[in-house]
């Protein structure tokens, strides 16, 4: 899910270092559910029934086939527009990853720091500083304001940051803009997986959760396609950054019509609003049971919204925080950003000299893997996908090590390197990317979910920065083969960790998972 190359810079021939008005509570719940009513009515129309028939000379009736056999499973459709709006934040995340891939050279030339690799790296990496701060403050803010309002508040730095960057005429201005964008991304990337896990019906929570990864992939691909004219127009980067403000407006507007999390509504005592959301998203038959489960969890853990950071040191929260932080450390140290960076040089060796074209191949592979994950995650489960993903990444790394470290025909070596790179990206996208961000809120308690996700993502950003900081030094000192072998070894370690410490959450409601953790500190 979370792929970014925020420190390393690629050049073809070298490596270098709003304000919104809010309707009344119940009125909003009814208005926001208009999406859901439309899609639920469409779902009913899709049902196909069959009639029993009997020929005059038949001795036996042909039994009618139950309608369910032919019914399309569209139970996810009511929640889809709401979680799609939230996933616009991931589209922005992906867009801002890709938007600096090529134009950084033109930006440096126009703003007067061309050739200074430290300043070029700072323009790219200050994004991480903002994202780190955003991830820390996201949890307390969502506890206080709810998901919809927090989303909308933090579209402000996303929009302002893009506009400030687009109009920048000095290094300070571009740094300010990039920091603001990072701040907004840091908050929203924490909110999206939590929002989806709390709004989506249990049966479809995994498939809808992969929209985070899909949104990121689409954002990267769109930014790469939009960046093609930048090769001929040195000022095109301003247009690209102006365009970056538009999804922020769409996110803010869309959240005005999206539903609030029913679990958050219950926490703050808005039971009537929560029932309206559940009825329209999950179905009328789920209302009483869902509210009963919510209240049961609150009775066990307390309904006080102001959970403290120190609570993450107590069981079972400490175990979930440990799993969340460890999964993100392993994800980043398995080398996703290093592989993405070096993939441009790998493609260049086989004649694909355009960095944008090489990145597009990688982006499409990433997108294909995310689509496969959306199909498999609620069938095979989170744990199997996570383990299989890391095993696939390990095999891919060792294949590249073999290709670059052993005396092979040059064409064969290059072909194996390309194959290994694409296999690695696909394997990442099918498990390590989407599952990591999804399983952490699923395991977290309702009381501490925001803070655990904030902690986990802050670890993600620190790990991301460290990998980006040292990757090129390690490659220059030890060679690509050694570094990639270490990535493969970390991938094997991540597969073992996933087997030993993660638990399967497929098909379980968040309340069932939380009660199991509270009662046994484990899930069998």
Curated annotation (Swiss-Prot):
GO terms for cellular component: chloroplast membrane. Keywords: Chloroplast, Membrane, Plastid, Sugar transport, Transmembrane, Transmembrane helix, Transport. Gene3D superfamilies: MFS general substrate transporter like domains. Its main location: plastid. The chain crosses the membrane at residues 88-108, 122-142, 151-171, 179-199, 208-228, 239-259, 320-340, 357-377, 386-406, 420-440, 452-472, 483-503. It is a multi-pass membrane protein. GO terms for molecular function: transmembrane transporter activity. It is found in: Plastid, Chloroplast membrane. PANTHER family: PLASTIDIC GLUCOSE TRANSPORTER 1-RELATED (PTHR23503:SF103), SOLUTE CARRIER FAMILY 2 (PTHR23503). May be involved in the efflux of glucose towards the cytosol. Belongs to the major facilitator superfamily. Sugar transporter (TC 2.A.1.1) family. This is Probable plastidic glucose transporter 1. It comes from Arabidopsis thaliana.
């Amino acid at each position: 899910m979370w792929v970014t190359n925020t420190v390393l810079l690629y050049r073809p021939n070298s490596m270098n270092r709003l304000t919104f008005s809010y309707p009344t509570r119940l009125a909003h719940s009814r208005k926001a559910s208009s999406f859901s009513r439309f899609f639920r009515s469409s779902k009913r129309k899709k049902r196909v029934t069959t009639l029993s028939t009997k020929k005059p000379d038949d001795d036996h009736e042909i039994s009618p086939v139950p309608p369910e056999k032919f019914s399309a499973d569209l139970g996810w459709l009511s929640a889809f527009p709401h979680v799609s709006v939230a996933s616009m934040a991931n589209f922005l995340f992906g867009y801002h990853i890709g938007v600096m891939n090529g134009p950084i050279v033109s930006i440096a030339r126009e703003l007067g720091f061309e050739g200074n690799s430290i300043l070029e790296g700072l323009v790219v990496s200050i994004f991480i500083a903002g994202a780190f701060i955003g991830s820390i403050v996201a949890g307390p803010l969502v506890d206080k304001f709810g998901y919809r309002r927090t989303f909308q508040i933090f579209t402000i730095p996303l929009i302002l940051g893009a506009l400030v960057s687009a109009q920048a005429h000095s290094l300070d201005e571009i740094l300010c803009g990039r920091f603001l964008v990072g701040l907004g991304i840091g908050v929203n990337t924490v909110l999206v997986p939590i929002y989806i896990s709390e709004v989506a019906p249990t049966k479809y929570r995994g498939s809808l959760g992969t929209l985070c990864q899909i949104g990121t992939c689409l954002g990267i691909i769109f930014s790469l396609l939009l960046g093609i004219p930048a090769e001929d127009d040195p000022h095109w980067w301003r247009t690209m950054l102006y365009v970056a403000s538009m999804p922020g407006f769409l996110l803010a507007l869309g959240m005005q019509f999206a539903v609030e999390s029913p679990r958050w509504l219950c926490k703050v005592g808005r039971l009537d609003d929560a029932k309206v959301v559940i009825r329209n998203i999950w179905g009328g038959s789920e209302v009483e049971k869902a509210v009963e489960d919510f209240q049961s969890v609150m009775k066990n853990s307390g309904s006080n919204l102001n959970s403290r950071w120190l609570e993450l040191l107590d069981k079972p929260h400490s175990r979930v925080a440990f799993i969340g932080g460890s999964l993100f450390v392993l994800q980043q140290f398995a080398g996703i950003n290093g592989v993405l960076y070096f993939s441009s040089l790998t493609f260049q060796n086989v004649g694909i000299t355009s960095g944008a074209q090489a990145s597009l191949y990688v982006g499409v592979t990433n997108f294909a893997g995310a689509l496969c994950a959306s199909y498999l995650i609620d069938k095979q489960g989170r744990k199997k996908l996570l383990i299989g993903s890391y095993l696939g990444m390990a095999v891919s790394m060792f294949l590249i090590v073999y290709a670059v470290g052993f005396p092979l025909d040059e064409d064969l070596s290059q072909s194996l390197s390309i194959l290994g790179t694409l296999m690695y990206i696909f394997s990442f996208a099918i498990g390590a990317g989407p599952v990591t961000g999804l399983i952490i809120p699923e395991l977290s308690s309702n009381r501490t979910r925001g803070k655990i996700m904030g902690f986990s993502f802050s670890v993600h950003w620190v790990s991301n920065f460290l990998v980006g900081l040292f990757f090129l030094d390690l490659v220059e000192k030890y060679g690509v083969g050694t570094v990639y072998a270490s990535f493969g070894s970390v991938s094997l370690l991540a597969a073992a960790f996933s087997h030993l410490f993660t638990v399967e959450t497929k098909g379980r409601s968040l309340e069932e998972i939380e009660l199991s953790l509270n009662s046994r500190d484990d899930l069998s």
